[in-house]
Amino acid sequence: MGKEHNNKKGICFLVGAGPGDPGLLTLRAKECLESADVVVYDYLCNPEILNHAPSDAEKIYAGKKAADHAIPQDELNDLLVKLSIEGKTVVRLKGGDPYVFGRGGEEAQELKKAGIPFEIIPGISSSVAGPAYAGIPVTHRDCCSQLTIFTGHEDPTKQDSVIDYSKIGQADGTKVMLMGVGQLEKVTNEMPVSYTHLRAHETSLHLVCRLLLE
């Protein structure tokens, strides 16, 4: 059963579900799910993780697959506030980590504005877990002391991009692009890396997609 709140204001947990493998869910995330009255979950959350929630907890699918959002972000923000005001324990379940390109910051802002108690539960980001499961260390003492994580899918309503792909391409260290499959050709064209640079740094290129979700 979820927690009883006696009509008092509830609480919202912004929970990172990790990169897909249910075994990588944190203990704190599991505790939050076990106490949930409502779970609002994303496309990238492994369905098995929902089994930690009470059988009578309401499950609401928010989508978040590329541009296919079951619930637009503004409406989603309002929903989290509404459910919490009703006195419910709400778990907002997100793939990876809520604050790594997960729009958790936007949701936290709206909850704070509405005076809703909330807590951030970090999750393991696919930016490090994906490469690790593929046998790729994102840092190495002998050859890589820098890690750059960037998105391949910026807000389309922005007037100008804040990412300079050409500079990222020339930088040392490991580069991890998230949400970039649909933008792969565009980004690689704008991220020129000379063959001399590749040979000098023994650089390898890898595409990792849905590694821990299937």
Model feature map: region roles:
Residues 47-48, 66-68, 125-129, 146-149, ...:
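Short gly/pro/ser/thr-enriched loop/turn and capping motifs at secondary-structure boundaries
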Residues 17-24, 155-160:
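Short gly/ser/thr-rich secondary-structure transition/capping motifs
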Residues 163-194:
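Conserved anion/nucleotide-ligand pocket segment
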Residues 208-214:
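Hydrophobic alpha-helical segments, chiefly the membrane-spanning helices
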Residues 34, 53-54, 168, 192-198:
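Short, conserved loop/helix-junction motifs that constitute active-site signature segments
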Residues 97-171:
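Class I SAM-dependent methyltransferase SAM-binding "motif I" and its flanking Rossmann-like core
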Residues 1-17, 27-124, 129:
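Class I S-adenosyl-L-methionine
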Residues 196-203, 214:
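Conserved small/polar residues in nucleotide/adenosyl-binding loops
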